[in-house]
UniProtKB/Swiss-Prot annotation:
LRR repeats lie at residues 32-53, 54-76, 79-100, 102-123, 125-146, 148-170, 171-192, 194-216, 218-239, 241-262, 264-286, 287-308, 310-331, 333-354. SUPFAM superfamilies: L domain-like, P-loop containing nucleoside triphosphate hydrolases, Polo-box domain. It comes from the Eukaryota. Signal peptide: none annotated. The gene is mfhas1. The keyword Cytoplasm applies. GO terms for biological process: inflammatory response; innate immune response; regulation of signal transduction. Residues 637-861 form the COR domain. Probable GTP-binding protein. Functions in innate immunity and more specifically the inflammatory response as a regulator of the Toll-like receptor TLR2 and TLR4 signaling pathways. This is Malignant fibrous histiocytoma-amplified sequence 1 homolog.
Amino acid sequence: MAGNDTCNNSCDVKTARLWRDAALRSRKLRSSLRQLTLSCVDKRKLILPADLGDVEVLNLGNNSLEEVPDGLQSLSAGNLHVLILRRNKFLNVPTAVYHLGRLTELDISYNRLSCLTEAVGLLGKLKKLCLSHNQLRTLPRQLGMLVDLEELDVSFNQITHLPDTMQGLPSLRTLDLDHNELCSFPQQLFHVPALEELDFSGNKMLGSLPEGIRSMQSLKILWLSSTSLCLLPDSICELVNLESLMLDNNNLHTLPEGFGALQKLKMLNVSSNAFQDFPVPLLQLVDLEELYMSRNRLVVLPEVISCMTKLVTLWLDNNRIRYLPDSIVELSFLEELVLQGNQIAILPDDFGKLSKVNIWKIKDNPLIQPPYEVCMKGISYIAAYQKELAHSQPAVKPRLKLVLLGLKDAGKTLLRQCLTDEQNTSTLVQGYKGIEITNWTADAERGLAFIVYDLAGDQSYDIIKPFFFSPGALYILVVNLKSYVCKHFYTHVGYFIHLITSKVPHAVVCIVGTHIDLCNEKELEEKCLDIHHQIAVQEKRDSETLQTLIQTVDKALSQDFDFRASNPHSAFYGVSDKNLRRKKTHFQYLMNSRLQILSPVLCVSCLDFSNIKRLREKLLSVAEHREIFPNLHRVLPKSWQMLEELHFKPQELWLTWWDSARLGLQAGLTEDRMQSALSFLHESGKLLYFEDNQTLKEYVFHNLTKLIDILNVFFQRDASVLFAKLTSDATADETKVTQFHHYVEGFLLHGLLPTHIIRSLLKPHIKTHQDLQLILELLEKMGLCYCINKPKNKLLNGATVWYKFPCYVKNEAPHAEAWINGTNISEPCLAVEQLQIEYSFPFIFPPGLFARFSVQINSHIVHRSDSKFQIFAYRGKVPVVVSFQPARGALQPGILSIASHASLPNIWTAWQAITPLVEELNALLQEWPSLYYTVHVLCSKCLKRGSPNPHPFPGELLSQPRPDGVTELICPKNGSERLNVSLVYPPTPTMISPCSK
């Protein structure tokens, strides 16, 4: 019996499960029948299915409909509650819609409605009505008959006033009036009792709020962004249920005294206003969690800001704040702290207590304590630094980095020797050794020391010169006044001004004229005045260019996004407000990042030492100037200084991490405190330590002089010198000599070298195979070369391992298909679409960028074929082409483009091919914080036609999702030409906007 019972129970359970599964399937089927989405196929007329009686949600959006399908009105007797008609082409609300009396939700946004008729009153059961992004100027009085209406969205229209009957909407909770043409705050809203959320942003002529706003007691969320508000009425303080208040992009400079009464406020945005003082009433908002005060004129934060203990988000970027109160470290819940673009030099002690901060932005501040390099690494590094400072005796050691640069034969090396070896004038020799480093104790009594970098003028070294540019250095631009002529100002001076500006914002530059013993007095005066004048002209021209760009962005921001998105001729077609604001911020940053050029031109002679003493005194004076070089007067932990000095002693090329850690122990640094110290020494250019590289993180390259000697070997481009190094071994026979000639020729023409030849070239500098491997790994990390047949294992079956240095490639064109060279796609390939992303550099193209980019992309591509200015390769089976077009005067900027192609259905493969390359290029460009460049996506249709000037779509679109419901874009080069949206927008946003630095 027991067995039968068990069997019966089991059968009952199985039967119950079958019935349950059937019920679930039936419920799911009914659910799918309740929601129906219909789409047009090939622009045919939309036809409704026969039986829609059970359908509750009908979506006819994104169909470009001008009229609704037949039979829609017959659904009035059914269960239809939600009708979606968004993104069509309706000029009026279709009559059939007004007969659907059971509707509770109607979405007819993104159409072309110019009016809403009084028949809207027939939709008496509506709870949600969306009419945004149309062309409505008025709303009918009958809107007041919709007594069940809870949500109304009429944003992005042209409404100038609201009907009086609006106050008859007792259930209305959410009202969106964003971006209309309302000139005053509608008093009808005072009598909408249930209103909780109101968006009034973008009604630009508001100016002020009426006192009667106090009656809106139910408000929880209020948006008043970009409404030209100059003053808030006291009555706003009576909206005691407010939780979020947006007041950004106005002209406010104070808040009402009673503002602290808004005790339920959780979020306040007053960014982009005119506050000069921190509003005292805010200090009473002890439960405030988010405060945005970016882009104001704040100078000081109050000490009692610590009473705002619940703050999680605090944005204070782009103000004029000089210091932070010590009490800010008590804001223990802070997770976002944005302070970039201020004048903060010192962070409070115990700043590391803000351990929850995960969004931290501090760049563009004159930080000296902790050092800028430490602050940029994050809160944990600041904590480690401050802890170290507390553990050890602080030490101050002024040691200024001096960078000499200029054209070949400008006199840099002789000038360095005159400055650093004043006692011995007989030893002066011209320098052709490449880049050289000299330590110069300028004044032992005053403790002033310099480390002098003499950057070679030969263009062969252009790829590595930027590695020696760093913040906090003094740049001496050396000009040969004998060879200087006015019409070549840009070559002698202007180019270097652009170079330093792009790499090092706010850099200090001293211009020194040499060879004055070869010039007469009148010639000197004229040339110095010309240099001074042309610098001013160039700086003014650049500033005016940037100012014009800012005005262009401002004009675009003054337009509705909907206008930009629908107007192909707009300068920023489809670009979001967020990206435009980011772009404007970047342009303003470029405007404020100009060089500090010490004038006038200092003229010297290295032959008779004329004015050398005066130049020395000038350099010492500048070095001691706290406002010019505050970093020289920062306090560092003595243990960090000792660690630096201990690393100078070993003569080896590199140290293992453990060797370095043992030196750290001598300096009093335990292993856990070592990482921060090494990171600082790397960021400040004292040694190289790559903690982000799997191989190199185990080593410390402390001997920079030897490393520079190694770099000089590769970049001097002198065949006789290279050949001499290879044949220095007396045992070299005639066969070997011939091979050496072949290798040198291959290197100088194609950039190719095998490892055994590299080892021979570096023989004086490296001793072991490990030395060689680490140097090659380091050169790859720096983007100077790549291995073309790197073995996956340690052995390559006896084959020779080759390295390629792209900067040496001289052949003009790689072997590639015809379309790469600009010829039209042949007839069978007309279905192929081309993707091309173009980077343009109007002021200056970073030297060596194309060669370094060529190295960085090597891990992403196969079957590559390189020329001097072009790379043809594959990513998987998809072709990619990287091209560089050097600048040709002011009217033809340098251009770097990344291209691929595929058929339209497979265009995602082309995006997949170029996206990693775009990301690598963006990463390299981050090294040039003040570089002005643009990014565009070129029109595929124009490229297919062979147009010499294809239309450029804004590169910002790469960082935006594809617009909802949009399948085609218009090319303004030909108004009737349409291209698929997938040819401009990637499948998902793939890159940071070019102005996000």
